[in-house]
């Protein structure tokens, strides 16, 4: 009994490898874009909700002796 195996040529293998690589790169880019969006939105909310902390103005401080 004869068994035939399909052996793809090099061009087909390269094309499939490039397609898989592009798919992985698109997925990676979308994940980084999502992470950057989450970080930026968190920072934006944090800066808009919390007033700046620092020294109070001079008129509320006791004068130095």
UniProtKB/Swiss-Prot annotation:
Gene Ontology biological process terms from the UniProt entry: apoptotic process; apoptotic signaling pathway; autophagic cell death; cellular response to gamma radiation; cellular response to ionizing radiation; imaginal disc-derived male genitalia morphogenesis; intrinsic apoptotic signaling pathway in response to DNA damage; larval central nervous system remodeling
Keyword terms, alphabetized: Apoptosis
Superkingdom per UniProt: Eukaryota
One term of GO molecular function: ubiquitin protein ligase binding
GO cellular component, as recorded: mitochondrial outer membrane; mitochondrion
Additional information: Ectopic expression in the developing eye results in a small eye owing to excess cell death.
Subunit structure as annotated in this protein's UniProt entry: Interacts with Diap2 (via BIR2 domain).
Function: Activator of apoptosis, as well as grim and hid, that acts on the effector Dredd.
Protein name: Cell death protein rpr
Taxonomic lineage: Eukaryota, Metazoa, Ecdysozoa, Arthropoda, Hexapoda
Gene from which the chain derives: rpr
